[in-house]
Regions:
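S-adenosylmethionine
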Residues: 1-437
Length: 437
């Protein structure tokens, strides 16, 4: 089974079962036993089609004699894969893109007798007319974001930031890793990774982070197995850096999976004190435990726990509480492209949940302690507005300025929204709150 078939199965799983593309693709790559080269191609094809679905449909309409809505969903998936290869992957011969697509149609569309012929005809037309296709002009078609999402982002983002975010959402993000400075240093790890053929460089503003390309499956690297690094977006790392954690502190990370913020906290505290890392799902708590063990961290205590539940014996017990709240995820579309297609109505109840979690977790902060609130979305209704309502109901807390790297403007508000494309990060919101003495 090749990369194209794996990518097709991932697209089908996402469409039919509501699976997330990254999870479905990872499982299918393992199931199909793809080597690193085919795994990379499968990922590029799956994410590329996800990122460009509306744009590919725009092209398809120019080549079909019938209506797009009349296509069988799997035929449409196969045509998307073929067109994406022809349009975006110039190293793949056109003949291979066409022929492999026809074979997929024969295998997966046996009940649609004309499917192979249709796929062949459409893609050969595409090859013949390549370079003269009409290009989309609307944001919805050009950047493959639903109209409703574009309208929401337009009213949520600062002026001039909408199109840069849409562009960033369709880029392939680099992999950023945090060096485990308790075991090694950036220079030594960089040299080791380069020796394995990995292209890497220091992150331009985040200390002890490396940016990787051509990395393949990181889990196969000896340095990964030895716990010398873990993957974390610089925005997520920055949120922990802004907490100003000190050695020996008692820290609660209430929505911790997969563990990146707890790991960053451990490095900040040099594996001293204690970090209780919670998640509501047992398998995710186990994931945190496995990561901490691999990295050699001793101060992390994984716990299966619901962040909306109070606990009397934790009242005022922590120097810092980290709340990385469940959110709409609109800041990480570049990593999970299918988020853009989710029903926005399902996100309207999130602010109430976020406020509830923040209120419950605030009880566990000691007088003078720190409460960090973060999300991976750019919507004010899940960010600034949640903080405003929390502070109105909890006058014993106040916002505190953020200490940021020099690349950022001076921050006095205690809140920072990162827009994808601005600082080479995911979209993210960070707020630092302190409890009065």
């Amino acid at each position: 089974m090749g990369a194209r078939e794996t990518a097709l199965n991932a697209l089908i799983a996402c469409r039919k079962n509501g699976a997330w593309s990254n999870g479905a693709l990872k499982q299918l790559i393992a199931r199909d036993r793809l080597d690193s080269r085919d795994a990379a191609l499968a990922a590029r094809l799956c994410y590329g089609v996800m990122q460009n679905r509306a744009k590919l449909d725009f092209y398809l309409r120019q080549m079909l004699t019938g209506k797009l809505s009349g296509l069988h969903p799997v035929v449409r998936d196969i045509l998307h894969l073929g067109l994406y290869q022809l349009r975006e992957l110039d190293k793949i011969p056109a003949s291979a893109a066409v022929n492999e697509s026809v074979e997929l149609a024969r295998k997966y569309c046996s009940r649609q007798k004309n499917a192979p012929a249709l796929v062949n005809a459409v893609l050969r037309t595409a090859v013949r007319t390549l370079g003269s296709w009409q290009e989309p002009t609307s944001y919805a078609d050009r950047y493959s974001h639903p109209e409703a999402l574009i309208a929401l982002l337009k009213q949520s983002l600062p002026k001039g930031q909408l199109e840069p975010m849409l562009i960033a959402d369709n880029t392939i993000p680099p992999i950023t890793i945090q060096v485990n400075t308790l075991k090694t240093d950036p220079q030594a790890l960089e040299s080791a990774l380069i020796s394995h053929g990995v292209t890497c460089a220091r992150h331009r503003w985040m200390t002890d982070c490396l940016v990787l390309t051509n990395a393949g499956n990181l889990e196969h690297l000896e340095e990964f197995r030895a716990g010398l690094f873990y993957v974390q977006d610089p925005a997520s790392r920055l949120s922990v850096q802004c907490a100003g954690l000190q050695e020996g502190w008692q820290v609660l990370d209430c929505c911790a999976a997969p563990g990146g913020k707890s790991f960053a906290a451990c490095l900040s505290m040099k594996d001293t004190g204690k970090i209780i890392s919670c998640d509501v799902y047992p398998h995710k708590a186990e994931l945190i435990a496995a990561g901490a063990k691999r990295l050699g961290f001793d101060n992390i205590v994984p716990l299966c726990r619901d962040a909306t539940q109070d606990r009397a014996d934790w009242t005022g017990a922590f120097d810092a509480v980290i709340v990385d709240a469940p959110c709409s995820g609109l800041g990480i579309i570049r990593k999970k492209p299918d988020i853009r297609y989710k029903d926005l109505a399902q996100t309207e109840q999130l602010p109430a949940l976020q406020e509830n979690i923040l209120a419950v977790q605030s009880r566990f902060v000691r007088p003078g302690g720190v409460l960090m609130y973060s999300t991976c979305t750019v919507l004010p209704r899940e960010n600034e507005q949640v903080v405003a309502r929390f502070l109105e109901a909890h006058p014993d807390f106040y916002r505190e300025p953020l200490a940021l790297p020099e690349v950022f403007p001076r921050n006095e508000s205690g809140m920072l929204t990162l827009i994808p494309g601005q600082y080479d990060t995911d979209g993210f919101f960070i707020c630092r709150l302190r409890r009065k003495q």
